[in-house]
Amino acid sequence: MIYAELSGGLGNQMFVYAFARAMGLCCQEPVTLIDRQDWKTGSPAHTALALQALHISSEVQFITDAGFAKQHLPVQNAAKALMIRHEQRAGLMDRDWHPFEARMAPMLNAIGLHFATEGFTPAKRGHAKNFLAWGYFQGADYFKDQAETIRAELLPIENPEHGFTAAAA
């Protein structure tokens, strides 16, 4: 199973979706997006789920559980927390940390985590039962092999009554 934690507004959520969906299509595995709903506690890193205004595949599931990764993906979640802590303590948040993330990617992918905050870092599925994607994935290289499908799914749902889009009912 491919899991991806959503963060940010609609634009960031679209990139997370594109990465996870492309990986799921490539690996022929189901995809579940985790909406941690941490905006409810005032976290600046996440806003409300916004993907429902797009033609998201019905094959992609959503979980709204702040503790899902910690509870069900403990190895991946612990590795993610260590990466964040290391980047904060090493001062990498203040400069380009992509080289560090790229060096760590093979080991993290092997245990079922892909951690990417900036730039393109190739992802490999690895042998872990579950795979957690965390980051922003802001690059077309993450989904170039599935670009036609992804682009079609990221189109807004048209609603003639409102002139442009509205959330799906």
Tell me the role of every PLM-derived stretch:
Residues 45-169:
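Secretory-pathway luminal glycosyltransferase catalytic domains
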Residues 1-48:
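N-terminal pre-catalytic "stem/leader" segment of glycosyltransferase-like enzymes
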